[in-house]
Amino acid sequence: MDLARNLKIDSVSRLNPTPPYQVGPGQSVAEAAALMREKKVGCLLVCRDGRVVGIFTERDLMRKVLAAGKPLTLPVADVMTPDPVQVHRKEPIGAVIRRMEEGGYRHLPVVDDAGRPVGVLSVKRIVHYLVEHYSPTICNQPPDPAIVPQAPEGA
């Protein structure tokens, strides 16, 4: 199949977004960081009454808390990114890639028809999807095509 065509017809659901791990706005940064570590994720959705009100990412933790010397007891609401851009699970992948690139986003909440969070889409999932569309010959090329490997990869 043609990548350009697939980017228009394949939806976000095809990317198998990660589960929407959540914290409440009043939970501490320490609690959020512990959950991120436990679940091995780069972000958490901050939800109130079943709706996304913010997103708390590794970047938020590093820049707004640790680098700023703020206490880990702060509520997540004080350092989260409020009202993040959200994508619908049926939205075409191509449109989502464009939004992520334009906004510089690495994670986006995925919502259903009722606006409830159903997942988180990461750049990593997008990269895996794109790699599926290239032959192994292209993916295994050396960074400099003039370099000829001395042995087959994995030998």
Per-segment meaning from a language model:
Residues 1-155:
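Tandem CBS (Cystathionine beta-synthase) repeat/Bateman regulatory domains
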